[in-house]
């Protein structure tokens, strides 16, 4: 049996007024927030999809369908904790995470340390096991036009 598994995740949400911006479980000061059924934390969603994908367990929509009112406004860190428990129950643990958040604004670098700490606490990791990079889309496409924010994540799982 393979002792390592790798998963890839992606998420994108539209930026709108009257919502808070949450990335990696941290509220980021900005005049716009992400629209979604839950808190629309694209970074945490991409990480969850990568974790699930590594074990061929589908995606977060399967476990937390947007059609189910019980997930309305859900804190993505609560969902991440459930996905983490799902992989732990199958005998796997997270080895490391590498991720990229793509946004024209706001500048995310000042918040990356807090995001890493918040995610590490949920996943029982050291902060240095979580890489978070921030970049822009060079004003190209919907993210470049500041219509949304997206995130990519790669997760390495290790058999316990």
UniProtKB/Swiss-Prot annotation:
A Pfam family that the UniProt record links to this protein: YgbB
Pathway field: Isoprenoid biosynthesis; isopentenyl diphosphate biosynthesis via DXP pathway; isopentenyl diphosphate from 1-deoxy-D-xylulose 5-phosphate: step 4/6
Catalysis: reaction(s): 4-CDP-2-C-methyl-D-erythritol 2-phosphate = 2-C-methyl-D-erythritol 2,4-cyclic diphosphate + CMP
GO biological process: isopentenyl diphosphate biosynthetic process, methylerythritol 4-phosphate pathway; terpenoid biosynthetic process
Domain of life of the native organism: Bacteria
Keyword Lyase: yes
Swiss-Prot/TrEMBL site (Transition state stabilizer) positions: 37, 136
Signal peptide: none
EC number: 4.6.1.12
Cofactor section: a divalent metal cation
MF-aspect GO terms: 2-C-methyl-D-erythritol 2,4-cyclodiphosphate synthase activity; metal ion binding
Cofactor, free-text remark: Binds 1 divalent metal cation per subunit.
Binding site residues for a divalent metal cation: 11, 13, 45
Coiled coil ranges: none
Keywords: Isoprene biosynthesis, Lyase, Metal-binding
UniProt: 4-CDP-2-C-methyl-D-erythritol 2-phosphate binding residues: 11-13, 37-38, 59-61, 135-138, 145
Function: Involved in the biosynthesis of isopentenyl diphosphate (IPP) and dimethylallyl diphosphate (DMAPP), two major building blocks of isoprenoid compounds. Catalyzes the conversion of 4-diphosphocytidyl-2-C-methyl-D-erythritol 2-phosphate (CDP-ME2P) to 2-C-methyl-D-erythritol 2,4-cyclodiphosphate (ME-CPP) with a corresponding release of cytidine 5-monophosphate (CMP).
Assembly description: Homotrimer.
Family statement drawn from the similarity comment of this UniProt entry: Belongs to the IspF family.
Protein name: 2-C-methyl-D-erythritol 2,4-cyclodiphosphate synthase
Organism: Nostoc punctiforme (strain ATCC 29133 / PCC 73102)
Gene name for this UniProt entry: ispF
């Amino acid at each position: 049996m393979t002792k390592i598994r790798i998963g890839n995740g992606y998420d994108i949400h539209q930026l709108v007024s009257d919502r808070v911006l949450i990335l990696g479980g941290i509220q980021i000061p900005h005049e716009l927030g992400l629209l979604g059924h839950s808190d629309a934390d694209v970074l945490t969603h991409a990480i969850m999809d990568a974790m699930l994908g590594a074990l061929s367990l589908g995606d977060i929509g399967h476990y937390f369908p947007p059609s189910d009112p019980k997930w309305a406004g859900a804190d993505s860190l609560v969902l991440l904790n459930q996905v983490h428990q799902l992989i732990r129950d199958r005998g796997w643990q997270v080895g490391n995470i590498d991720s990229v958040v793509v946004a024209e604004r706001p500048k995310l670098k000042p918040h990356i340390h807090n995001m890493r700490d918040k995610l590490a606490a949920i996943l029982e990791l050291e902060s240095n096991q979580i890489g978070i990079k921030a970049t822009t889309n060079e004003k190209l496409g919907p993210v470049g036009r500041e219509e949304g924010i997206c995130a990519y994540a790669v997760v390495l799982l290790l058999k316990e």
